[in-house]
Design a protein with these regions (language model features):
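A cross-kingdom signal targeting lumenal/periplasmic-facing segments of multi-pass membrane
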Residues: 1-81, 85, 93-94, 117-119
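Active-site-proximal, structured, solvent-exposed surfaces of multi-pass membrane proteins
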Residues: 55-197
Length: 198
């Protein structure tokens, strides 16, 4: 199950609602290398390659692993050898709607031509997965990936090694301190909002 990956710790269950703690939550600010923006290849069309490239640039392990698959015209199929979280990237931009059949479960995806990763969820080893182009007669050219929990753990440890400790937090001010092994860029995970200053 997803809980077996060590990424989430179950905290509470009430009716059919589950509460988990994410074990790999980063603090508000972390140090990244000066050359991150120059070396991280953001213009790659496949988002899985962009994520893996970030991991490599940081000096960590990849977070997504390509799995063997087969393109059968308007269908795409694969059978995982390992249980885990699986994703598919459809590279044919003429495909807009895709349905995924995983055992007895189905999922539908719209706007696939926007180039996002299709999150299939947890799939058990040996369970065949079939995706179909529900939109037209275009070939379903795609790539399947398994999420690698150890890769995320590796990225987390690299980023968390030099992280910011909050010393004050109010509605209008955030103060913190950071000790770092070497000079770099301070990355803050605060979305831009007019009125804030550093």
């Amino acid at each position: 199950t997803p809980a077996d990956t060590g990424l989430l710790t179950p905290l509470e269950v009430e009716d059919h609602t589950y509460l988990y703690r994410n074990e790999y939550t980063l603090p508000l600010g972390v140090m990244v290398p000066y050359d991150l923006e120059d070396n991280w290849q953001l213009d790659i069309t496949n988002p899985a390659d962009v994520q893996n490239d970030l991991a490599v640039v940081l000096g960590a392990d990849p977070v997504l692993e390509e799995v063997p698959s087969e393109i059968l015209g308007t269908s795409f199929t694969f059978t995982p050898e390992v249980s885990g979280d699986y994703y598919v990237y459809v590279s044919n931009k003429k495909v807009e709607k895709v349905s995924a059949l995983m055992g007895e479960n189905t999922k539908s995806f719209d706007n696939v031509n926007r180039g996002y990763m299709l999150e299939l969820g947890w799939i058990t080893a040996g369970e065949e997965v079939t995706l179909r182009n529900d939109d037209n007669e275009q070939d379903l050219v795609a790539v399947a990936y398994r999420f690698i929990p150890e890769g995320l753990e590796s990225v987390y440890h690299v980023l968390n090694r030099n992280s910011m400790e909050l010393t004050k937090k109010t509605d209008t001010e955030i103060t913190g301190r950071i000790d770092t092994e070497k000079a770099g860029l301070l990355y803050l995970s605060i979305p831009y909002d007019k009125g804030w200053s550093i």
